[in-house]
Amino acid sequence: MLQENCYVVNDETKECVIIDCGAFWEEEKKAITQYINDNELVPKHLIATHGHIDHNFGNAYIYEKFGLKPEVHASDEVLMNKLNWQAESIAGIHLDYEMPPVGKYLTAKDTIQFGNQTFTIIETPGHSPGSVFFYCEKEHIAFSGDTLFHNSIGRTDFEGGSKFMIIQSLRIICQLPDNTLILPGHGEETSIGKELAENPFLDR
């Protein structure tokens, strides 16, 4: 719907996590379940980098298919409680179904475990109060949501956004190794090193 990137991440154990399920159209939803079924994956978590509707359109579908409730940072509780309102006010879409309740509100002390993998949670407020990076140190990968993009950063003019906070968050994530692959919520993949070299908003 809003050209948002959804990720299904698995390892050799076949356990997987679904990140930022913004699937709105039926073909998008079916593509996710087909990938999971074709690869005989076992979904363990449905996680969101933040509480905006474009990253959560598919939550009801995933809950119906796999029984997973979304997990999101606690600071985005307000946003998660009004996803249907967001759909109407931001995307002009009336959803004729209710979203599932949040299964767990996350903090920086939590980790996401599946298979042999562990994601740590880096709090990156600014685009929204509860924006996070999901960081896998073992694989040198970070899922950045709408905080960091190739040559750009997230907007801060939405409810709860803060330009000051996103700048503080960028200073933190700049400390990740240069070879960290960044998989954003929109657009193409990049890396910390590339963004430090090319992104005008980043500076160590």
Name each model-derived stretch.
Residues M1-N39, F133-G145:
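Conserved beta-strand hairpin/beta-sheet module of binuclear metal-dependent hydrolase folds
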Residues A23-K29, T33-I112, A197-F201:
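Active-site HxH/HxHxD metal-binding segment of metal-dependent hydrolases
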